[in-house]
Structures are given as structure tokens and as C-alpha cells.
């Protein structure tokens, strides 16, 4: 019997010694997700470096896996609140998962607060849009530039894509060609496209004679946009479901197109594209 026990130990011991502990498994998993796509040191070395990366690569209004500074999963709400504190920036993580992963990185206390201030402002705007998800689209009744009446009943049975804009908004106009192509792809599907403009009917008609925009255009919508929807940044893009519930809110055309396509969570700008001038940090 003693010899049998010795023989069993000879065969079983290697199996026991090779088995990973739960702690070791967690370390491996963390190693798979903690590699940032962009160098943290590079980003915080210069405000313009960070802003160019953040503007082109980070979409806080998209769906993403949120990781705290210890690489632990947290809710999107908690993630945005951490960013609002001004103590962190976020960097996309190199991951093989389909869902984009963002991780929090703490800013040095002695760093110039320019990055912190802009990060706080951007995260706050994203948080305000995030809170809109799941809420009912406000009641409205309006006539578009062609005399067709619209109300909440228009949402029934279809997904509605909405854009806010005004004529002198350069960013609003710059994305119209991209949105026209988007409409062409989905015009025969159960998706409709509405735009809420702050301008009056006549200026809009004059604008549309020279500039094609394939969304239905609703004039004089500043009250709906800024007082009911509480949106102050233009353009903003919303997806409303067939029950009139706001499903998603985005800041860029590329993000809403990507969401509808369900191909990627965010269409990233070409590396040759330049970010717009950094916003004031104050």
C-alpha cells in the first residue's frame, strides 16, 4: 500500500503543480487588457497630443467596456463620473473583443490642469447624453419646410434618426454629405430621418436650394432642442425607437452611422485627419 501511495504521488504532483490558481488566472486576464493603444506618457506630455487622440479615438457616447484604473469592469455611469472628477483620462485598450474597451488612467497631481479641465467638460457632456437614454422623447407637433405635419405619432413602427443643427454651424454642414450617403443606404428600410433646425423656414429653403440634405427638415426647433431636450451642443444625433423612447445619443455623424450599421462601435477618423483646435481649458 505504501508503494502504491508513492506511485500515485509521482503522477498526481505534476498535475497539481501545473494548475493555475484563481489569482494567476486573473493576472493573465489583466495582462490581456491593460495594454493601451496609445502611450500614456506621450499623451500627458503635451495637451495637443492628448486632445488630438481624445477627439479622434475616444467616443464616450458609444457602447464600450469600462475599466477602472485597476483594470476592473465598472458601469459606464461610474466610469463617466470618474472622468468628471478631472483626476483621470481614458485610453482605449488593445483587446481582441468585439466591444471597445476604455480604461481610466490617473493624471499626475503636478500636471498642468489644462487636460483635466477639458476632460471634465467632455465627460460631463457625455454623461448628460447618457442620462437621456431610455427616456421618452418630448411631445412635439410641428410642420416641416414642405408643409408636412409631424408629431410623436411619427415615431410609431419605425426607428427614427434625428439631427440637431443650424445653418451657420460649420460642423453641422460638414457632415451632411456623409449623412446623405447614410440615408441612401437605409432609405428603403424601417428607418426615417428627421432634422431639427433652429432657423426659420425661408432661410432653410434658401439654404436647401444650394445644399442637398436628405433628412426631413423641421424649422424653428430651438425650444424643443434646448428647453425640452436640454441640448446645447450642435450637432447632436439621437436614435428614437418605434415607441418614442430615446435609445442612443451621439455627438458625431460617424458614431451614429456606425451604431446603425452594427459593424463597429465607432468609425475612427483617418490618421491623416486633424482634430479641430482644442477647446479652451477653462
Each language-model region and where it sits:
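N-terminal low-complexity, Pro/Thr/Ser-rich intrinsically disordered segments
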Residues: 24-59
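Short pre-active-site segment immediately N-terminal to redox-active cysteine/selenocysteine motifs
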Residues: 158, 165-168, 200, 233
